[in-house]
Amino acid sequence: AFSFTDKVYDFKWKDDFAAARNFAFSRGTGDYLFWLDADDVVRQEERRKLMDLKRQLDDERPDVVMLKYAVGYDGDSAPSFFFYRERLLRRCGKAVWKGRIHEAVEPFGKVVREDIMIEHRKVGTGDPDRNLRIFEQMLREKGKLSPRDQYYYGKELYYHRRYRDAAS
């Protein structure tokens, strides 16, 4: 990272993805904030589209730009499933991440969709129990989950074959 900039920051991990993204966004200085995960890929053609989009921002002034996020691939590794995700956000007080797991920014103001694809190319399995552990910690701390968190908690319980817990 230091080969590109001297602006490299350290965030002490605390099982909260929204806190990590909000920390990163707090360091942004431009009119817009763009994010990627370490295992996201932007192909060359998509990079050209991003540069074209960058030139249009001053004229269109969107608050949130939703880009395609590929998360499923066919047998030839070509993207086969995607959804739109907030990727480029106007730097303002409304660009706030929520959710310790499966974090998101609630869309605000002028929202546009662009035909630009980011590919999620997960490397390795990581900690298969991480999300479940965080959800259970949230329940111990708060006693309840938001409807969105309940949905993802149910999925984690299902993935861990805790079907009765997932159904309740």
Residue spans of the language-model regions?
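Acidic donor-binding segment of Leloir-type glycosyltransferases
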Residues: 1-10, 14, 23, 27
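Catalytic-site signature of metal-activated, phosphate-bearing donor transferases
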Residues: 19-25, 42-165
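Catalytic metal- and UDP-sugar-binding loop of GT-A-like glycosyltransferases, i.e.
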Residues: 36-38
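Alpha/beta-hydrolase active-site loop signature
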Residues: 15-16, 40
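Short aromatic/hydrophobic "clamp" motif used to bind/position activated sugar donors
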Residues: 33
